[in-house]
């Protein structure tokens, strides 16, 4: 089924992954993107485009595993918003780790240059665009 391999342009699912120390999982992109107001998007929460044959939670799980090698369980949706420039719906999921260690090698080195655990207060320094207010509240920042 070819449609199963095709990505949807409707949803981007991102994971807000916390470890036992309360640190947040972040990725540094290989290719920096230009955001609104000239901001350069380099660091992001792991995640990506939803395929037609998967749920939002399945997408978040797959993308986080592919980008970071961490196996996670999405436990609840934090926020949903429409991106103003590219007209996609961005869904933020709070995720817990199924294992504190990576269970696989990251499969997307062409997209992800670095994987890093950071303290919640460091997220604002890494995210150069507007941080979703519900995500900020969830992280306590």
PLM ranges: what are they?
Residues 17-18, 26, 95, 117:
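Conserved hydrophobic "DFG−1" position in protein kinase catalytic cores
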Residues 1-25, 46, 80:
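Conserved N-terminal beta-strand and adjoining loop/helix that marks the start
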């Amino acid at each position: 089924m070819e449609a199963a391999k095709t990505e949807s342009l409707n949803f981007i699912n991102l994971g807000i992954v916390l470890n036992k120390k309360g640190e947040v999982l972040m990725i540094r992109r290989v290719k920096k993107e230009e955001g609104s107001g000239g901001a350069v998007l380099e660091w992001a929460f792991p995640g990506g485009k939803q395929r037609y044959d998967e749920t939002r939670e399945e997408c978040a799980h797959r993308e986080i595993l592919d980008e970071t090698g961490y196996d996670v369980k999405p436990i609840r949706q934090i926020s949903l918003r429409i991106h103003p420039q590219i007209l996609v719906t961005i869904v933020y999921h709070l995720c817990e780790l199924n294992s504190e260690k990576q269970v696989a090698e990251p499969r997307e080195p062409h997209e992800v240059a670095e994987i890093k655990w950071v303290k919640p207060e460091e997220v604002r320094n890494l995210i150069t665009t507007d941080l979703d207010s519900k995500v900020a509240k969830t992280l306590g920042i």
